[in-house]
A protein has these predicted regions:
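Generic alpha-helical transmembrane segments of integral inner-membrane proteins
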Residues: 8-16, 115, 119-123, 187, ...
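Hydrophobic alpha-helix feature that most strongly marks membrane-spanning transmembrane helices
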Residues: 70, 74, 124-127, 134-137, ...
């Protein structure tokens, strides 16, 4: 991609995003009146912009998640730590095995464990893109590239939420978060990617 295309897209997306956020945070937002935005979604955006005002409400889990990841330091507190101050044992995060599983990983396995998870997810996504580049036909390339893009996008959003870089979205961490529908969908997608790769070898 050329820089002209990249800057052109940014020139359109950034102002639109700023306008959307400005409309979303208004008390009587037109986005809520039109049904484009739900009230709980507005609260999530507000809690991201003003965490101190929502520290006991919508921002509670994200703030505790950041604390948990930081408390793991380099090596972590150990697998299934019994410390009452941990996010699991202290119930500081509701259902940590779902959207906020990375907070538990950061706390129990530290920076090293967190980096390992990120690298593994990145390797899976890169392998999908590699299969897409070698695919025999366009449909196979789209399937493999789509799965790679999905894993990268979903991982980025989830990690952004857990580290409070992004507002809470409810997206799971691929292959790790608890959730039958998410896991089955991802495994089915990876099965398609493996099939595309098999077709490449046969060709």
């Amino acid at each position: 991609l050329s820089y002209k295309v990249i800057f052109g897209v940014l020139a359109v997306v950034v102002p639109c995003l700023l306008i959307f956020i400005n409309l979303a945070v208004q008390p009587d937002s037109i986005l809520i009146e039109k049904g484009i935005l739900k009230s709980y979604q507005q609260n999530r955006i507000l809690s991201f912009l003003y965490p101190d005002e929502y520290e006991d409400k919508e921002a509670y889990q994200q703030l505790n998640s950041v604390t948990a990841i930081g408390s793991g330091q380099l090596d972590g507190k150990g697998y299934k730590t019994n410390e009452i101050s941990s996010v699991k044992n202290g119930n500081y995060i509701l259902e940590p095995q779902t959207d906020f599983i990375f907070a538990v990983i950061g706390e129990e396995f530290g920076f090293k464990g967190s980096c390992t998870v990120v690298v593994l997810l990145l390797l899976i996504a890169l392998e999908c893109l590699s299969v897409a580049a070698k695919a025999k036909d366009l449909s196979g390339a789209i399937i493999a590239a789509g799965m790679g893009g999905l894993i990268i996008f979903q991982s980025f959003i989830n990690l952004g939420v857990v580290t409070f870089i992004l507002p809470n979205t409810g997206l799971t961490l691929p292959f790790i978060s608890y959730g039958l529908t998410s896991l089955v969908s991802l495994y089915m997608g990876m099965g398609f990617v493996l099939n595309v790769r098999l077709q490449c070898k046969r060709g």
